Amino acid sequence: MGDMANNSVAYSGVKNSLKEANHDGDFGITLTELRALMELRSTDALRKIQESYGDVYGICTKLKTSPNEGLSGNPADLERREAVFGKNFIPPKKPKTFLQLVWEALQDVTLIILEIAAIVSLGLSFYQPPEGDNALCGEVSVGEEEGEGETGWIEGAAILLSVVCVVLVTAFNDWSKEKQFRGLQSRIEQEQKFTVIRGGQVIQIPVADITVGDIAQVKYGDLLPADGILIQGNDLKIDESSLTGESDHVKKSLDKDPLLLSGTHVMEGSGRMVVTAVGVNSQTGIIFTLLGAGGEEEEKKDEKKKEKKNKKQDGAIENRNKAKAQDGAAMEMQPLKSEEGGDGDEKDKKKANLPKKEKSVLQGKLTKLAVQIGKAGLLMSAITVIILVLYFVIDTFWVQKRPWLAECTPIYIQYFVKFFIIGVTVLVVAVPEGLPLAVTISLAYSVKKMMKDNNLVRHLDACETMGNATAICSDKTGTLTMNRMTVVQAYINEKHYKKVPEPEAIPPNILSYLVTGISVNCAYTSKILPPEKEGGLPRHVGNKTECALLGFLLDLKRDYQDVRNEIPEEALYKVYTFNSVRKSMSTVLKNSDGSFRIFSKGASEIILKKCFKILSANGEAKVFRPRDRDDIVKTVIEPMASEGLRTICLAFRDFPAGEPEPEWDNENDVVTGLTCIAVVGIEDPVRPEVPEAIKKCQRAGITVRMVTGDNINTARAIATKCGILHPGEDFLCLEGKDFNRRIRNEKGEIEQERIDKIWPKLRVLARSSPTDKHTLVKGIIDSTVSEQRQVVAVTGDGTNDGPALKKADVGFAMGIAGTDVAKEASDIILTDDNFTSIVKAVMWGRNVYDSISKFLQFQLTVNVVAVIVAFTGACITQDSPLKAVQMLWVNLIMDTLASLALATEPPTESLLLRKPYGRNKPLISRTMMKNILGHAFYQLVVVFTLLFAGEKFFDIDSGRNAPLHAPPSEHYTIVFNTFVLMQLFNEINARKIHGERNVFEGIFNNAIFCTIVLGTFVVQIIIVQFGGKPFSCSELSIEQWLWSIFLGMGTLLWGQLISTIPTSRLKFLKEAGHGTQKEEIPEEELAEDVEEIDHAERELRRGQILWFRGLNRIQTQIRVVNAFRSSLYEGLEKPESRSSIHNFMTHPEFRIEDSEPHIPLIDDTDAEDDAPTKRNSSPPPSPNKNNNAVDSGIHLTIEMNKSATSSSPGSPLHSLETSL
């Protein structure tokens, strides 16, 4: 039986014999050969390696690298390798050019209508009827000044020019947004690091710097950034479903299947691999390339053609695509992101699986509101056109009895075009295109600022969803506590030491067991390094619990590194790595005499149950009976736990040389009959700022629950220190076992009614598995106990937390302690792992909601007034007092600028003083409705007074009933100017939506707001004074300006009057903007949702989706929505995010398919799914045990089959900061 020690001896010469490739000679293996090798599987690959290279060390020799020392790190050598084998980077799809974005913006239905109308108007304006026919054709140019008749073309030209401005602004918005997304994307990529060995040193380098020949260390939770071949492994199991579609975890070993592929997840174990392919040459890169090449064609083809195309592809690729469809993770792997990722099979995926997540609260409400406004606008514009046409026809041909003359036809058509333009103007005004822009700006602004608050938002909508959070299920370690662990108590040689004992107090043989057991039975990647600054604390690298144990040895004046030098990792005979099911780790050593010794460490109650002996005060082993164990639990473990300490038991077992060798793959038979060495108590202090943060959450109506793997007494003590539990309160603390027993029926099935009896009072879930966390989150979300559906946020750091993170409305992954898999499944990454950052996310989320409401209050006031003025003015005077060009200015510029001004208000602590809005609370409250109607009333009175009596007051000519191409009138200019200034001052009123009186409070904290208000005012002066005919404006005098400003400022005084009226008295006021209820959506619309909302656009075209149902269906306009079409949005897969307003972050690059993983969790079936494990039943023993462990005790098979349809961020701010 060979073991790894033999391997390391046999090849110990390799590292010395290999020199770095600094000369110009070629490598002994080509890129093509490596690619061909990595396409083989298991035994085929093994045979090829043996036939062509001897073994993996032969490949290392040809790649001029050392399996122990790695590459030297010489820059010239690294450059040469990149030149020969490529960079670890997949080039993203080219961004759309500015001209492409302009063309997209031109596709807007309303703009097209306006363009056609303007062109017709322009063409007809050059027609003059024959002399003498003017009188017969009606008043076309009567009363015009000399030469004015020839300027009829200006209005058409001005509309065209306005459309050009709109298109350019829209395209520029798209372009800048895309640029911003790409910047965020590159930031993520730069911050993503992986552990490699260079020059004998273990270092972390950016994923993009990994090159062929690097020796990479892989561990539980990693997402592999490149293809490689295993050099050494401990119980390594990989989830390859992202490439193969096979959900069972694949065991990797030197003698069975040594190939490791990029984009796959390490679900268990650890090891080292030599990198053999990177970037576009890796298996995932090859798929990306194929998808990228076919991406544009596929977009144009329908489903059937796509299916045929897929059938034609060769087996391997078909297999990979299938895998992608099933899992979605392949394309999302964070290290190698590319926009091509999710395009190919997205539609197939979404049809196969309905979305698991509902649309976000805000998106649902906005969608419904948009539909209502769109329908109302369409109706008003249609009625306006019909009334104008009928009035003109009846007046001209019926009342005046004029004949229809052929030469007058162009004149009549000009009238009809004018009426049509007025109708379109009403529609333009009615639909608040600024709304999607406000949503985008608000979320984008928030996301940017949240980075400073240590929240890296991967899915835009998660930011807004956090504002509605009603429950947070938080981990304990590192989130509520500092994750700096130290051993502070110990039970050794039958004595309970309240502080770390002196080494002299411990019998030498017990000390020897302790030192060897801790040194070899902690991951070799866990270590304690000297402090970075003088006088600082030593740096803990790797698993923090293991670092506490290594620190314990240093306190005992022993050096773990000496033991590791003597017993290198390659010499470990067998390792049962830690996972969330085992809650322990065991390492087997083979002694020179042929005997074996196993060291185990883990949760004290678990390891103690396996102990049959204990080391006594004199260092001898004595029998350890159940009652002795109960005594230790009562006198040692419970007192430690009640002080908030985590207890770890250390034990060992000897296998004498004469006895038959055990069946190493049967862990239950191996890790039993142990001898207890010691029990240690590890302290992890509560973060000092956490109790105050939890108090804020509770005040804000958010319930905080702790979900931890620690023992229940430790968990209860920490929960009390944090303020989650208070003395005398009637709340539940349950262990995972007890929780499962209470929520399952006699058949072992989970029942929602049972969960509903528990979760409202549950505050602490201890000794819980990731499955328990997922069950709890799902139970709370699916519950119907409360009126409102709960909105749940969850924190997670482990590989198996993925399902819970995905199921939650918002998943938070730990940026420091979190695994790649957890980060990939999350919506927000906490870059400081701190609970207080979650509270900041709540503040920002609520602020987004408020920002949208502020904008709505402002926008709807503008819309109500403008529509009524345009409609009534058109019907009474046959002309809109507000011209098309003026309305485009009000609509585009003021909407855009107002959305920027109101959407960038910073959050305040007062946001945490009220309860969550809830899923059914309308966007427009009764107070807001009071403000909208109140201000609209004031503005309408002012506008109509000016319209019908203004000429007398100012002693000027009336602008009413002007002929077709009349010059601009002072009268209508005053109406327009006053209208705009009223909006400007009302923007200040709109800053407050909860009835506050001081609308100026904090106004100077928002420089953007002040700049925009002043800037808009300056532009308005220019338009009025110098706009002339194109803007239908006439210069105004100082007096007229002062009156306009006075009437505008009146809105501030009127606002004070409105705020004094109690809303409760106004019973007639209704709320608006409720969320869409499920029963309101017809089935075909649901199907449409799957089509539209689950697609890649979900992520990127969040704004468009907002309006899809309503406005797209009734073919009305939404011009700024197209601004959301940035190329990032195109063809992106949906990030995990909830379906919510726009995933800022979602570049395909940042994305992960959000669909819910199919986990054979025990809540789905009574027994655990062991079919897969039977299929993979352990093979006959092989010489190298180190690579062949199978956890046959418990099979936790997690299929990461992510349905494409759930939301997922592929990743742009799939999204954003720490190493994703």
Curated annotation (Swiss-Prot):
It is a multi-pass membrane protein. It comes from Mus musculus (Mouse). This is Plasma membrane calcium-transporting ATPase 1. One of its GO terms (biological process) is intracellular calcium ion homeostasis. Disruption phenotype: Complete embryonic lethality. Mice with conditional knockout of ATP2B1 in enterocytes, are born at a lower frequency and are smaller at birth and into adulthood than wild-type. At two months of age, mice have a decreased bone mineral density. Mice with conditional knockout of ATP2B1 in vascular smooth muscle cells (VSMCs) are born at the expected Mendelian ratio and grow normaly but have a higher blood pressure than wild-type under resting conditions. Heterozygous ATP2B1 mice are hypertensive and exhibit hypocalcemia and a higher bone mineral density. The modification Phosphoserine is found at S8, S17, S338, S1140, S1155, S1178, S1182. Catalyzes the hydrolysis of ATP coupled with the transport of calcium from the cytoplasm to the extracellular space thereby maintaining intracellular calcium homeostasis. Plays a role in blood pressure regulation through regulation of intracellular calcium concentration and nitric oxide production leading to regulation of vascular smooth muscle cells vasoconstriction. Positively regulates bone mineralization through absorption of calcium from the intestine. It catalyses: Ca(2+)(in) + ATP + H2O = Ca(2+)(out) + ADP + phosphate + H(+). The modification Phosphothreonine is found at T1116, T1165. The gene is Atp2b1. Residues 1100-1117 are annotated as: Calmodulin-binding subdomain A. PANTHER family: CATION TRANSPORTING ATPASE (PTHR24093), PLASMA MEMBRANE CALCIUM-TRANSPORTING ATPASE 1 (PTHR24093:SF245).
